[in-house]
Swiss-Prot record:
It comes from Bacteroides fragilis (strain ATCC 25285 / DSM 2151 / CCUG 4856 / JCM 11019 / LMG 10263 / NCTC 9343 / Onslow / VPI 2553 / EN-2). Pfam families: dUTPase. It comes from the Bacteria. Substrate binds at residues 63-65, 76, 80-82. It catalyses: dUTP + H2O = dUMP + diphosphate + H(+). Pathway: Pyrimidine metabolism; dUMP biosynthesis; dUMP from dCTP (dUTP route): step 2/2. Gene3D superfamilies: 2.70.40.10. InterPro entries: dUTPase (IPR008181), dUTPase-like (IPR029054), dUTPase-like_sf (IPR036157), dUTPase_trimeric (IPR033704). Its cofactor is Mg(2+). This is Deoxyuridine 5'-triphosphate nucleotidohydrolase. This enzyme is involved in nucleotide metabolism: it produces dUMP, the immediate precursor of thymidine nucleotides and it decreases the intracellular concentration of dUTP so that uracil cannot be incorporated into DNA. GO terms for molecular function: dUTP diphosphatase activity; magnesium ion binding. The keyword Acyltransferase does not apply.
Length: 144
């Protein structure tokens, strides 16, 4: 699939690390480092602008290594970039650790997954179809 992209950053375009990777790493495009204190959040620009085909979205997800080792994650995970959005892709990061984390220019801060989606059409009814599970939730299956 071809996706139109404008790269106003100083960094390479997002790319798949391996042949079977689902996500592409996205880099910070900042003029100076950002110090992210514990429990602080910030909006990090990427310098990327994209035009997705109809029926697709870009999901912005945390990088597992950054989350595990440093406590840095995407606050609204997954962040959604709609096919009709044409602004700069910016990432909302939050520091869930007890230590300040410094984001450097060009640092890989999140990953982007391109995914198909459907738009739902609501059908109002008086009663829902019965299922074995019914209304059970939040640990109902005994596994949590």
């Amino acid at each position: 699939m071809n996706i139109q992209v404008i790269n106003k950053s100083k960094h390479p375009l997002p790319a798949y690390a391996t042949e079977l990777s689902a996500g592409m790493d996205i880099r910070a495009n900042i003029s100076e480092p950002i110090s992210l204190a514990p429990m602080q959040r910030c909006l990090v620009p990427t310098g990327l602008f994209i035009a997705l085909p109809q029926g697709f979205e870009a999901q912005i997800r945390p990088r597992s290594g950054l989350a595990l080792k440093k406590g840095i994650t995407v606050l609204n995970s997954p962040g959604t970039i709609d096919a009709d959005y044409r602004g700069e892709i910016c990432i909302i990061l939050v520091n869930l650790s007890a230590e300040t984390f410094v984001i450097e220019d060009g640092e890989r801060i999140a990953q982007m997954v391109i995914a198909r989606h459907e738009q739902a059409v609501w059908k109002e009814v008086e009663v829902l179809d019965e299922t074995e599970r019914g209304a059970g939730g939040f640990g109902h299956t005994g596994r949590g």
